Regions:
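A conserved helix-loop-beta module that forms one wall/lid of the active-site cleft
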Residues: 90-156
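Acidic/polar helix N-cap motif
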Residues: 47-50, 106, 129-130, 162
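Generic secondary-structure signature for well-ordered alpha-helical cores
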Residues: 21-24, 59, 63, 84-87, ...
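Short beta-strand-to-turn element immediately C-terminal to the catalytic PLP-Schiff-base lysine
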Residues: 7, 127, 157-162
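Short, hinge-like loop/turn segments at secondary-structure boundaries
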Residues: 44-48, 84-85, 110-113, 141, ...
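ATP-binding N-terminal substructure of ATP-dependent carboxylate-amine bond-forming enzymes
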Residues: 1-98
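Conserved ATP-binding module of the ATP-grasp superfamily
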Residues: 65, 120-123, 143-145, 161-185
Length: 185
């Protein structure tokens, strides 16, 4: 069985390490992988979000199973695209569809999902207008958390200590695009 692990972090190294010990694994590839995965298989010079490149590698290396670690390729629909590849023999894929991954890739979607289904979660407000957000932070309840809605590589959560600090954060996210589109809400 030929396997492809997508990602370059410690999580993907741990997955590749465990998979490499299986007797059914013939070849192990990682895209892009890291120094640790290089000793376990072959690192491919592909970014985890290079969906066309990954699809090409699946065909070129006759991949049977793809394990996707990072959230970004999941949110970009990698598993959905893999299921459409090679209709006669699509590769198996370990990872959710783009629709299912949305619960991780969109904080506003996740919080709304929990509210609709009665799942306990902290109170929240979603703003796509900077002016409305700035008006909201001027009144209690304090303290609160400012979160970028999209994927921000662990950098999208802020604990401001004052309305002024919260305003600076909101302006940086929504106007300055400090986290790109992740901070649009």
């Amino acid at each position: 069985m030929n396997l492809l692990v997508v990602g370059s972090g410690a999580r993907e190294h741990a997955i590749a390490w465990k998979l490499s010990s299986s007797s059914i694994v013939e070849r192990l590839y990682c895209a892009p992988g890291n120094a640790g995965t290089a000793g376990l298989g072959v690192n491919l010079n592909l970014r985890a979000d290079d969906i066309p490149g990954i699809l090409g590698a699946v065909l070129d290396y006759d991949i049977d199973l793809v394990v996707v670690g990072p959230e970004l390729p999941l949110s970009l629909g990698l598993t959905d695209r893999l299921k459409q590849l090679r209709p006669a023999k699509p590769p198996l894929c370990f990872g959710p569809s783009a629709a299912a991954a949305r619960i991780e890739s969109s904080k506003s979607y996740a919080k709304s999902f929990m509210r609709r289904r009665g799942i306990p979660t902290a109170d929240f407000r979603v703003f796509d207008d900077l002016g409305e957000a700035l008006r909201f932070i001027q009144s209690p309840p304090w303290p609160f958390v400012v979160k970028a809605t999209g994927l921000a590589s662990g950098k999208g959560v802020f604990l401001p200590e004052s309305p002024g600090e919260a305003g600076t954060i909101l302006e940086s996210l929504m106007k300055g695009k400090s986290l790109g589109d992740a901070g649009s809400e």
